[in-house]
C-alpha cells in the first residue's frame, strides 16, 4: 500500500472534528434565530392582539361598572 504521510489518522480525525464543530455551529445559529423569531412574534402579538384586547377590556369594565347605592336608600 502506498502511503504518502504516516500521520496515524490525524488528518481524518481533524476533518471529523471540523464536521462536528460545523454541525454544532449550525445548530447554535438555528437556536439563536428561533429565539429571535419568538421575540419578533411576541412583539407583533403585543401590538396587534394584546394591547387592543386590553383596551377593549378596560372599556367593557368601565361600561359594566355598577355605582354603589346611595346611603339614603339603605336607611330604614
UniProtKB/Swiss-Prot annotation:
Predominant place of localization: host cell
Superkingdom, natural source: Viruses
Virion surface compartment residues: 1-14
Ranges that cross the membrane: 15-35
Record topological domains on the Intravirion side: 36-76
Ribonucleoprotein as UniProt keyword: no
One GO cellular component term: membrane
Keywords: Apoptosis, Host endoplasmic reticulum, Host Golgi apparatus, Host membrane, Host-virus interaction, Inhibition of host innate immune response by virus, Inhibition of host IRF3 by virus, Inhibition of host RLR pathway by virus, Membrane, Transmembrane, Transmembrane helix, Viral immunoevasion
InterPro entries: E_protein_aCoV, E_protein_CoV
Compartments where found: Host Golgi apparatus membrane; Host endoplasmic reticulum
GO biological process, one term: disruption of cellular anatomical structure in another organism
UniProt topology in membrane: Single-pass type III membrane protein
Record function comment: Plays a central role in virus morphogenesis and assembly. Acts as a viroporin and self-assembles in host membranes forming pentameric protein-lipid pores that allow ion transport. Also plays a role in the induction of apoptosis. Counteracts the production of type I interferon by interacting with host IRF3 component and preventing its translocation to the host nucleus.
Assembly: Homopentamer. Interacts with membrane protein M in the budding compartment of the host cell, which is located between endoplasmic reticulum and the Golgi complex. Interacts with Nucleoprotein. Interacts with host IRF3; this interaction inhibits type I IFN production.
Family statement drawn from the similarity comment of this UniProt entry: Belongs to the alphacoronaviruses E protein family.
Name this protein carries in UniProt: Envelope small membrane protein
Origin species: Porcine epidemic diarrhea virus (strain CV777)
